[in-house]
Structure formats: C-alpha cells, structure tokens
Amino acid sequence: MANSLNSMNSVAEILEALPAEETQHMLRVGRLVDLFTRKLQSYSLVKERFDERNNFGSAAFYHDIGKAWIPLGILTKPDRLTEQEMHVIRKHPVFAQRLFDQIRLGLISGIPGHLIQLAADSAMYHHEWWNGTGYLYGISYDAIPLIARITTVCDAYDAMTSSRIYRESHSHDHARQELKQYAGIQFDPELVRVFLAADVGSAFFSDALLSHL
C-alpha cells in the first residue's frame, strides 16, 4: 500500500499522499457536483434537506480519498493499467470505508462532522452502477445514495474531459454521448437527463474559465 492508516492522524496528511493529478480531479468533481446539485434543485429532483444538499459538493470532494492507499506506481503509471492493476484500483472504496470508520471513532480528524456521512457515501458508492453491475457492493437504483449517483455522473464526465497520464482529453460532445449511452446502465437516467438538459458540463467550463480571468 502507498500508506498505512496507522501512520496518519489527519485527512490533510492523507490528501498530501495523493498525486496532484488526483487531488485536482477531486476538486473538479466537488465543484461539478456543487453546480449539478444546484441545477437539480431547480428541477425539483433533490429531495434531501436543504442544508444537506448544499453540502453535496464539499462532501463529493472526498470521493477518491481511498486512492491514498493505492501504490503510486499504479496511480502515476503513464500507460494503460493491466487487469491486475485495475483490480487494485477498484479497492479504493474499501480503503475509503476503513478510513471513515476511523474518522467516526475519532482516530483521524479533518472532515467536518456534518460532511462525514455524505462524504462516506460518495467515496464508498460512486462506482456502483444504476443496473447493479458496478463495484464493490453490487447495489442498484435508489439503493445507491443520491450523492453517490450524482458523483458517478460528475466523476465520469470529468474523467472523460480531462487529460490523463496515458491519453488526451475527450470533447464535451463525446462525454455527453457517453453519458447518454450509459444512462439506465451505469448512470441514473433521470440525473443524466438533467445533466444534459441543463448543459452542466458547458456551465462548469464557463465557470472555470471565468475563475481564471
């Protein structure tokens, strides 16, 4: 493993163990989830308590924190991963679950109390598929927490539209087509409908450009 839970006492230490590309991805996904959730509110599709749903973006930032226990050689590999390496990568929700168990016991600090459950749901379940064929738990439909279903869409969108070590970024239109193709399979179809109708991806890129002016 890249790190041991026993050697770290704070979430800040854990985040420092991640490559910059991973933390930048986590930041983008958190911001995208925040924007998407606000769009969902306008479509009256978010039924969680007002205070809770306003925390979705902040909580979703932690979705990939379990990757701190994946060997750096895998996370930073410049080529496509082997099936064995993908098997290791797919363990990161398990490491996230262990981390949040430690956080709840007060052994690791750094995530505000009101975010812990939401962050845990995002980190543990964002690779579950709508049709139940995802990992690790094989849950489906509404059994997947809403924040995880939202994170799944935003995580996939950012992964497609951002450059990776082993490939160039895909276009916004390509990402939209992929989301549409896998709606009802990987993604909650109603969430995809709103993501596309509200053109969340374009709005996110516009916000990102404005923030750098």
Q: Which residues fall in each region the model found?
A:
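Histidine- and acidic-residue-rich, metal-dependent catalytic cores
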Residues: 2-213
